[in-house]
């Protein structure tokens, strides 16, 4: 029985192994983020809701949870990698972040290291990501933390904040991200 720590250096990453929302056009990208509640840095792999009534992307709207997955814009491939991309408020002239949200359905599979909490510096190590007991991966499931939009382990320390009525994800495999960091391949099961 071993414990695998899934932390990250830099920003969270997503590898869209099989996200059907991309193919079927279930993508929304017209509303700005409510930075007062979601912060000034939006990472790939986080979840949010499309709140048409307030005209914002936030964590409390009446809509479904959708995966934030934006096109990575890295301008120096010699010095930058997937971990260096996030949507940062100060990078936009109007100060508004307009992310791309993708609907996930049962059976969708993607790989990520986006767990726990936001990384506010691209050089900071988020060492308190999640610890996974890899002796029985079928027993580990993830739900969305309603207060942060990040995935967390069902039955873990943040269990009271999890939306267990929303999407639930199971581990397919402990994996490695493109830059060598630990990651988890997930499949939506509910």
Q: Model-predicted segments: where are they?
A:
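Surface-exposed, low-hydrophobicity beta-strand/loop segments enriched in small/polar/acidic residues
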Residues: 1-190
């Amino acid at each position: 029985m071993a414990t695998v720590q899934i932390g990250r250096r830099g920003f969270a990453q997503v590898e869209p192994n099989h996200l059907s929302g991309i193919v079927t056009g279930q993508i929304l990208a017209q509303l700005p983020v409510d930075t007062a509640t979601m912060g000034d840095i939006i990472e790939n792999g986080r979840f949010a809701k499309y709140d048409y009534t307030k005209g914002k992307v936030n964590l409390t709207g009446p809509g479904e949870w959708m995966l934030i997955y934006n096109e990575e814009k890295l301008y120096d491939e010699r010095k930058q990698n997937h971990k260096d991309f996030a949507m940062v408020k100060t990078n936009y002239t109007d100060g508004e972040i307009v992310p791309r949200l993708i609907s996930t359905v049962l059976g969708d599979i993607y790989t990520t290291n986006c767990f726990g909490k936001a990384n506010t510096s691209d050089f900071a190590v988020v060492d308190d990501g999640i610890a996974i007991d890899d002796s029985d991966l079928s027993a580990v499931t993830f739900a969305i933390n309603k207060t942060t939009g990040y995935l967390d382990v069902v039955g873990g320390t943040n269990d009271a904040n999890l939306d267990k009525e929303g999407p639930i994800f199971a581990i397919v495999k402990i994996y490695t991200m493109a830059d060598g960091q630990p990651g988890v391949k997930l499949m939506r099961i509910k």
